[in-house]
Each structure stands twice: as C-alpha cells, then as structure tokens.
A protein has these predicted regions:
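Alpha/beta-hydrolase fold nucleophile elbow
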Residues: 168-180
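Alpha/beta-hydrolase-fold enzymes
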Residues: 187-272
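Conserved serine/cysteine hydrolase catalytic core
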Residues: 296-308
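The serine-hydrolase catalytic nucleophile loop
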Residues: 107-119, 133
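N-terminal cap/lid segment of alpha/beta-hydrolase-fold proteins
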Residues: 53-95
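Alpha/beta-hydrolase active-site loop
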Residues: 146-167
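Short beta-strand element of the alpha/beta-hydrolase
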Residues: 95-105
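Conserved alpha/beta-hydrolase
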Residues: 121-138
Length: 308
C-alpha cells in the first residue's frame, strides 16, 4: 500500500521541494496575513546544498528569540488537542497580530517539521501554533493513529477557536501552513471555515487521491476493492478482540531492495534527524495508521466544491 508519511521540509535530498515551498503559493498566502516584502524575500533565498544547511533549519531547532508554551484546547467534539504556542519575545503586547496554524505531515506529529515551521514564522513576528492532529501525538482520540479526515480538518478549526479568542491575535488574520497530508486537511477545513483566511501548503499530498489511485495512478480498481474487503474483514476481527492492524508508514529497516522514497523517509523518521516517539506510543507504531480506518481516505475529496 501507499506510504502515508510525506517528504519533510529542509530535506537534503529534496532541494526542489524546498524551493517549491517559497513559491507563489506561500507568498500569496502569507501576504494576506500581512507579511512584509522583506520577510518574503528572506524566505526566498536560493536552495542550499545538503552540507550548507544551517543549524536553524534543523528539525529540532530552538530559537533564542521565541518563547514556546505547551497548550491544550478542545475541539468541537470535546477531544483535547495538543499544541505548541510560539510567541516572539519582542511581541507588542498592546496590539493584535496575525497568527498561523501549522499542521504536521500525515503519520507524523508536531515535533516533526511543524514545530520548525512554527518557530521560523514566529521569528518573523507571527503568533504561531503547531498542532497534533486528533488521534496523534499529544492529542486525544482512540484508537491511537486512527484516520478521520473530518476530525483532522476539525483540528484546524479548533485551533482557530483557540487563537481567535487569544487577546494577542487578530482573528481576521489567521492562516494555516499545512505540511504534506495536512495540506489537504487544511484545505478541507478552509472550505467550510471562513476564519481560515490563507492557506499555504508544503509538499502537499491529497490523501484521498493518493489512497484511491496510488503512486502515479498505479492502483487498479480491483486492488482498491481488495483493500476495502480486507479492511472490512479486519473490523470483524478487531471487534471480537483481535489485535489492531497497522499499515503503510515508514519502514523500520533498509534493505538492498528499498526504494528511493523508502530511503528518504527512513533518513528522517527513523534517524536522530527527525525521529520522535510521542509519550505512550512506541517506535514500532510511529507513522503507521490503523488499517481499518485508513480506508476512510478513499472517501476524502478535499478539492471538491473548493469554490466555497
């Protein structure tokens, strides 16, 4: 089945994707939130080679000019969502500021790339909030690692609830940076939540199309139906006490036959460069969604009726 984890920012093997991040999509969205031309220019420097990547592009980078606070807040279904709130240390406390919600790659958690984007945007003067999608990381939801596109989208609306009631935030200038799968979840949220004024995506995956069609549209109709049949049967097994089955995600070891994309994901998610195991989880489960819930992506169409 299709790998659910996505390419991550500042990947030495993905200079082109790093370049794409700074294109018109990001610029238009951030301009709507009030980003100055100078800041956009700083974000638009030419991509660097792997050996030239600075320390402040490291996944676990911490900024001396930004404070971070762990927060929780309820979504519309009274599930607690975990986040990190980033504030510039020189933030003017007497005025309201633009805010950005940052969503992590599918199968990851906020500590894997979302925090980095949040802290870098806070350095530019934004109030930023990285979040764990429902069922992942520090956010509530059972079973762990479950797939629910609707609740993933709701995470961004819940974050808007939290930010829009913060006295430091201008609720008319709340935007989202969605990384990988969160790009499609943020778009899904914005279709029905006009409070999300600007959306920027990084290496976005349409998780619906990806699961229906596979890489390069390589999945046949019969293969898709077989996955649905297997998931349906697995539900019976788990309902009667069987073990939860997990799927896709990042491989745990490389072999001579490992594909380039498996190697790229492994280089981030399974090495000190990006590996992170949330409290209560295990390294063997990170990045792996539950098999029976993963098929819900096949009924996920984030771009349908996008004109709303």
């Amino acid at each position: 089945m299709l790998k659910q984890s996505c390419r991550v920012p500042f990947n030495p093997q993905s200079d082109q994707e790093y370049s794409n991040l700074k294109g018109d999509n990001m610029m238009r969205a951030m301009k709507q939130l009030g980003m100055t031309a100078a800041i956009i220019g700083a974000m638009s420097a030419a991509p660097v080679l792997a050996q030239e990547i600075p320390a402040d592009a490291s996944n676990f980078y911490k900024s001396e000019s930004v404070t971070v606070r762990q927060v929780t807040f309820p979504n519309q279904y009274n599930m607690n969502i975990a986040g990190n709130l980033f504030l510039p240390k020189n933030l003017d406390q007497k005025t309201k500021h633009a805010a950005i919600i940052v969503g992590h790659p599918m199968g990851a958690v906020k500590e894997q790339s979302a925090n980095l984007y949040a802290v870098k945007m806070a350095e530019q003067g934004f109030v930023t909030l990285s979040v764990d999608l429902a069922f992942w990381g520090g956010s509530e939801g059972q079973p762990r690692n479950a797939v629910s596109p609707d609740l993933y989208a709701e995470t961004f609306s819940a974050a808007a609830d939290f930010l829009g009631t913060n006295p430091l935030v201008d609720r008319e200038r709340i935007g989202v940076i969605g990384i990988c799968g969160s790009g499609s979840f943020a778009i899904s949220a914005a279709k029905i939540d006009p409070r999300l004024k600007a959306i920027a995506t990084i290496s976005m995956y349409d998780m619906g199309a990806a699961n229906r069609n596979g890489l390069r549209h390589g999945m046949t109709l019969e293969q898709r139906k077989q996955i649905l049949r297997e998931a349906a049967e697995q539900r019976y097994a788990e309902f009667t006490g069987g073990e939860t089955r997990y799927t896709s995600g990042t491989v745990h070891e490389l072999t001579e036959t490992s594909t380039p994309i498996e190697r790229e994901f492994y280089a981030f998610y399974r090495t000190p460069r990006g590996e992170f195991t949330p409290e209560g989880s295990s390294p063997q489960l990170t990045t792996h969604p539950t098999f029976t819930s993963n098929v819900k992506f096949m009924n996920f169409y984030p771009f349908s009726d996008i004109e709303t």
